[in-house]
Amino acid sequence: MTQPRADHNLVTDRGLAHLPEGEFEKRAAEVVALMKARAQRPSNGDPSGRWQEEIISREIPLGASVLDLGCGDGFLLERLIRERNVRGQGVEIDPDQVFSCVDRGVPVIQADLGAGLRWCPDKAFDVVVLEETLQTLQSPREVLEEMLRVGKRGIVSFPNFAHFRVVVDLVARSRMPVTPRRPFYWYESANIHLLTLRALLDWAAGSGVRIVSGYVLVDGASRELRPDDDLLAEEVLVVVERA
């Protein structure tokens, strides 16, 4: 795969701010109409909910040292230890999830990512994983910085809140989205920092971070990231490193 740069080449800028007066509103209405029509099509969904684990497993070298931040019940780390022979370490704040990790035989530390990773030396791990955790953190930028301090590479995945179904709910229905993959209302969701693909690329470009590779979930199927995926991607996974 051709290595994309971290300078917005993955998502093109459309220059809407420079349109003639009234043209922006016209184009915005056209986009909403198109998105409404597409939103009527059922999403295939991802039956397993584990598409990211397949890609993460491929991206991690055999025998690598791996730190999984917000490791949940330890499912991913258990798989990586078994299939990729990694030296794994999980970090999780939820006591019940920590017990699940212990039951699986997965090494785990109970800790709050918001407190930082001061206990971990620089470049102590080959890969640091942040799977479906970033949007739930109080200080996501600080955790991203820590991820790239303690790891040679990072793998980050998150729901794309610029997906067209989300935009339709917000613009056309004035409602926060509730989907099969995100079945929680705004007052019970753990997602406190809503992130988009473009926002992640902006952070990378401004922080000296290179996007090594990228993948998306579109209509229930995973594939490599394309330049026009900012509205199509339901979920995003990127591999990053310091430029």
PLM region spans:
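Class I SAM-dependent methyltransferase SAM/SAH-binding core
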Residues: F75, R79-G116
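Class I SAM-dependent methyltransferase Rossmann-like catalytic core
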Residues: V31-G49
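S-adenosyl-L-methionine-dependent methyltransferase catalytic module, highlighting the catalytic core
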Residues: R141-E146, R153-A243
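Class I SAM-dependent methyltransferase "Motif I" SAM/SAH-binding loop
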Residues: G70-G72
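N-terminal, positively charged/glycine-rich alpha-helical extensions of SAM-dependent methyltransferases
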Residues: T2-A37
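Short conserved loop adjoining the S-adenosyl-L-methionine
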Residues: G116-D122
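A short SAM/SAH-binding and catalytic strip from SAM-dependent methyltransferases
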Residues: V127-Q138
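Conserved alpha-helix/loop element of class I SAM-dependent methyltransferases that forms part
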Residues: P47-G63
